[in-house]
Amino acid sequence: MSLRFALTPGEPAGIGPDLCLLLARSAQPHPLIAIASRTLLQERAGQLGLAIDLKDVSPAAWPERPAKAGQLYVWDTPLAAPVRPGQLDRANAAYVLETLTRAGQGCLDGHFAGMITAPVHKGVINEAGIPFSGHTEFLADLTHTAQVVMMLATRGLRVALATTHLPLREVADAISDERLTRVARILHADLRDKFGIAHPRILVCGLNPHAGEGGHLGREEIEVIEPCLERLRGEGLDLIGPLPADTLFTPKHLEHCDAVLAMYHDQGLPVLKYKGFGAAVNVTLGLPIIRTSVDHGTALDLAGSGRIDSGSLQVALETAYQMAASRC
């Protein structure tokens, strides 16, 4: 039996539904289930001029074979309000979270080998009165996972984050021995178990410019990061650093590593997105399930226009397929 995967279209007024439909033009190697409003997909297909055959499926009768080119399996999930491309509506916030819940729970229950997510709009979900900081945190709660790690990857580069969506002024206080220990262990374990890398080598960024310049530009490297890395090396983790980020992100260093651990969001991700924007994938590590996502946002201004590239979603699909194969 072929592995099944769940696909969530994210914000209904954004480009997520468009991406799902564009992918359906080509056959996939595994059954791919779009957890979405059938009405939304029908309307968006008409706006895009796409002739996609939407095939209804449900937990009572999952497909065993991949859909053909021009077909898309849909687990219908009703909207609360009609959708106009590019126009956010907080009434549909619960719909977005329902698609994620169905996909995540389906993975936990063994219905899906992994889930692939299109972008959501955090702001409109919070405006609806639902606290929401992102896919990563939502899925951690759903799966009762205490610690997860956000990693983005493109060809030749993987970057994981010690901290994610924090104001910059709060980052230094968040870099603790406990946090770094958990993040490094998760990164090491998932590179081995989900990516099939037997002995992962990880480069670790310092927090401060020049990795603190021997304590003259900050002491986090001396007091927190270096002692933590040294102790983890004693557990068998191959950790290089802390290194100055502007030195670490050079070919000399990157060609000899499997992943980079950056201390904060905008330390590591600008480099990765410059290298591979449109062909990068967001992976949530530490979960008991496989979850990958695109590397871009909802692009409300492009929804329904046909002027989008589905490359990142295709990479997210391929990465999920590869990760699932590594676990089999």
Curated annotation (Swiss-Prot):
Keyword tags: Cobalt, Cytoplasm, Magnesium, Metal-binding, NAD, NADP, Oxidoreductase, Pyridoxine biosynthesis, Zinc
Enzyme class: oxidoreductase
Record SUPFAM superfamilies: Isocitrate/Isopropylmalate dehydrogenase-like
Pfam families xrefs: PdxA
Cofactor: Zn(2+); Mg(2+); Co(2+)
Family, as annotated: Belongs to the PdxA family.
Stated name of the protein: 4-hydroxythreonine-4-phosphate dehydrogenase
Organism: Pseudomonas aeruginosa (strain ATCC 15692 / DSM 22644 / CIP 104116 / JCM 14847 / LMG 12228 / 1C / PRS 101 / PAO1)
